[in-house]
């Protein structure tokens, strides 16, 4: 299945998550692409919207390919293939510091007037527009688990089967609309997949 756009994907996810409507779930979107989807889910499920800030650690010769990820606390997930992708320990340390600086800058930028919403005791749904390696989602789920949510759910429109297996170790429930065996990039499953910029994220979060 090819999704028309993120709006359609979010509508279908909302249907799949309908059991949580009325339970005031906390929808945490991974910026930037998933933030408009998170807004839609929060409205459909009568929930609350915020962002969870994590960054992928980029492979040295292919910045689109993740060799790990880092969360706001500095906790780092390093994939078992990182070294074979050319990521030395020194490179990873440099990349961690660079991505952590971006996370801190984005927190100030995205929610300047309030602290992050506390997920403790809440049904938490972490949404992204799709998973490739799953590294970013793993960091998001790990960071949130430490904050003791009542239930931690990963919700994505599309991800490859091997990635979903890894994600299941970190979430109480995984909702994925399709898991194709042939998977190159998230964008191949959307007819329209525009970039979401910081201004759009800020506008959405200012209304949340």
Language model feature labels by segment:
Residues 1-208:
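PRPP-associated nucleotide enzymes
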């Amino acid at each position: 299945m090819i999704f028309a756009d993120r709006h359609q994907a979010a509508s279908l996810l909302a249907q799949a998550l309908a059991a949580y409507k009325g339970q005031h779930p906390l929808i945490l979107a991974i910026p930037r692409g998933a933030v408009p989807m998170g807004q839609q889910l929060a409205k459909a499920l009568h929930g609350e919207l915020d962002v969870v800030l994590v960054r992928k650690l980029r492979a040295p010769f292919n910045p689109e390919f993740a060799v790990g990820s880092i969360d706001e606390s500095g906790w780092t997930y390093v994939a078992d293939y990182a070294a074979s992708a050319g990521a030395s320990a020194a490179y990873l340390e440099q990349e961690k510091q660079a991505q952590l600086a971006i996370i801190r800058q984005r927190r100030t930028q995205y929610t300047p007037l309030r602290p992050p919403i506390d997920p403790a005791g809440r049904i938490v749904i972490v949404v992204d527009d799709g998973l490739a390696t799953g590294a970013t989602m793993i960091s998001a789920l790990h960071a949130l688990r430490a904050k003791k949510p009542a239930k931690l759910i990963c919700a994505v429109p599309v991800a490859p089967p091997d990635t979903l297996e890894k994600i299941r170790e970190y979430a109480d429930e995984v909702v994925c609309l399709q898991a194709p065996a042939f998977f190159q990039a998230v964008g191949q499953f959307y007819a329209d997949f525009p970039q979401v910029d910081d201004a759009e994220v800020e506008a959405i979060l200012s209304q949340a």
